[in-house]
């Protein structure tokens, strides 16, 4: 069955794998998902990811990160802009949880965080928030 919202699917797979205490999760490949994964690695929310190509289709294998107590590094991850209701913000994007969390945006500069968007003076579509 085709997925209507690939970003929501990406977020849900990561959230469910973290709650189930899985070490890795597999997600169908797309360039956007690869860019999102790279950003989450840079910000320390996931350990690493690899692109695996099979005969049928490529996918991303994401290595999840946990605290010393075994809790997922991602405490909350949720979609903001949805197919039925797109959410955009200008260059003066507010901080999420007073700067403790991040908004992930799709902008003309690519996939960036709210902090990077404020520094570069760009806005865009708020894809999701993470804490």
From Swiss-Prot:
Q: Which GO terms describe its biological process?
A: translation
Q: Recorded GO terms, molecular function?
A: rRNA binding; structural constituent of ribosome
State whether keyword Nucleotidyltransferase applies: no
Any Gene Ontology CC annotation: ribonucleoprotein complex
State the source organism's domain of life: Bacteria
Keywords, in A-Z order: Ribonucleoprotein, Ribosomal protein, RNA-binding, rRNA-binding
What SUPFAM superfamilies has UniProt attached to this entry? Ribosomal protein S8
The family database entries (InterPro entries) matched by this protein are listed as: Ribosomal_uS8, Ribosomal_uS8_CS, Ribosomal_uS8_sf
Q: Which Pfam families match?
A: Ribosomal_S8
Subunit description = Part of the 30S ribosomal subunit. Contacts proteins S5 and S12.
Question: What family does the entry list?
Answer: Belongs to the universal ribosomal protein uS8 family.
Under the heading HAMAP family, the entry gives:
Ribosomal_uS8_B (MF_01302_B)
Q: What task does this protein carry out?
A: One of the primary rRNA binding proteins, it binds directly to 16S rRNA central domain where it helps coordinate assembly of the platform of the 30S subunit.
Stated name of the protein: Small ribosomal subunit protein uS8
Query: What is the species of this protein?
Result: Pelodictyon phaeoclathratiforme (strain DSM 5477 / BU-1)
